[in-house]
């Protein structure tokens, strides 16, 4: 049965454009503001929402997203509350796809079966769990897919033709191509290499390919959108939110508008790629 993610990418393909996937950390800077931000992202033009599950040791994340996770944890955010926040979002938005992104430890502690049951119940559509390789698919990937959730994997510039089939084997929804080596928010992608990498991946799969890491401006989003099925932006949004907080890291009246303005610019950049094609 198709998920919201599957349907959204079908809609984007029919519209002839790439999608915008936005990342924010659940509970940053607090639960109520975080929920408002999710709705603001959709208003601004986000096609798919990635919601970070706060964790104390986020090894793939750069300083911006690490700091966002710490703010969320300090504000009392938990995995249970993250799932509750998705339920609250779904009360007003039944169509926008939501992906939970993070690390396996909080899910393991919560209990895999309990987590998947609750995730499905509240309206989560997919998972990105960056520290579970394909060799560990029985831990979470296969149970998640059996529960009706997409399991989205990452490929990187170092994923070669020998490794790629294993990465793709149980991936569903889309493949997330990491455009740079290293942590989130570090550096700028080499756009010529991104184009060839996406083409190489598409030779092995019919899945949509989303490209992220290092996308910070409307222009860079536009450039990536010329080559990918979706553009993923996280650190730039998290940074904009941080800059709108007060000196104690608390929400201000500027938070929602600041994020909404940036994402509207990113969405326009992505959409302009289709207009120029």
Swiss-Prot record:
Gene3D superfamilies: Aldolase class I. Keywords: Amino-acid biosynthesis, Aromatic amino acid biosynthesis, Lyase, Tryptophan biosynthesis. Its EC number is 4.2.1.20. One of its GO terms (cellular component) is cytosol. It holds the Pfam family Trp_syntA. InterPro entries: Aldolase_TIM, RibuloseP-bd_barrel, Trp_synthase_alpha_AS, Trp_synthase_suA. This is Tryptophan synthase alpha chain. It comes from Beijerinckia indica subsp. indica (strain ATCC 9039 / DSM 1715 / NCIMB 8712). The lineage of its organism: Bacteria, Pseudomonadati, Pseudomonadota, Alphaproteobacteria, Hyphomicrobiales.
